[in-house]
A protein has these predicted regions:
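Short helix-capping segments at alpha-helix termini
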Residues: 5, 57, 109-114, 160-161
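C-terminal helical cap/extension that packs against the catalytic core
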Residues: 34-36, 43, 78-139
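Nucleotide phosphate-binding/pyrophosphate-handling subdomain across enzymes
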Residues: 1-87
Length: 162
């Protein structure tokens, strides 16, 4: 690749600063809430989510819509993403590899103390419930599986357009 010496380092830095990657700590503000869409589907991704969340939001409790696949290190993901005081809505991912939401709730309760966890039948139902039970300024995160991000983002943009 040919180097273009006419592009300043500042321009390159600005370009990187403005770059977004859908589903990688994608922050959307709307519906009077802050929504975070992040795959966080393995231990490293969950650790990255936790580091970024802590930098931006400190210890602010959040509502998490979560699915995790059976073959993932569920406890490692949960330990990083979920903190005491959080509320979690476990949902199925649209794959036969998904963990059953009821089982996921058990793992969450066993792994993180003082967490509220329940199931929802779908990502859309969980987001509607999360929205209903949160208030202006609250944080709703969707993570644990890349499989659920498309439906979550679609729900968000649909609700924003109405």
């Amino acid at each position: 690749m040919k180097e273009d010496t006419n592009i300043s380092e500042e321009t390159i830095r600005e370009g990187f600063a403005r770059t977004t990657w859908a589903g990688r700590f994608e922050v959307k503000r709307g519906l009077d809430r802050t929504f975070i869409f992040d795959g966080a589907h393995n231990a490293a991704g969950a650790e990255s989510f936790a580091m970024t969340y802590n930098e931006l939001f400190k210890d602010t409790p959040k509502t998490v819509v979560m699915a995790i696949l059976k073959d993932k290190d569920q406890e490692a993901i949960i330990r990083e993403v979920i903190k005491s005081g959080d509320t979690v809505l476990a949902v199925p991912a649209p794959t036969d590899r998904t963990e059953v939401p009821e089982n996921l709730v058990e793992v969450i309760r066993r792994t993180v103390p003082k967490v509220t966890a329940q199931t929802a039948e779908s990502v859309e139902a969980a987001l509607a419930l999360a929205y209903k039970h949160t208030k202006t300024g609250d944080i709703i995160a969707v993570c644990g599986s890349l499989y659920i991000l498309g439906d979550a983002r679609q729900w968000f943009f649909h609700e924003m357009s109405h």
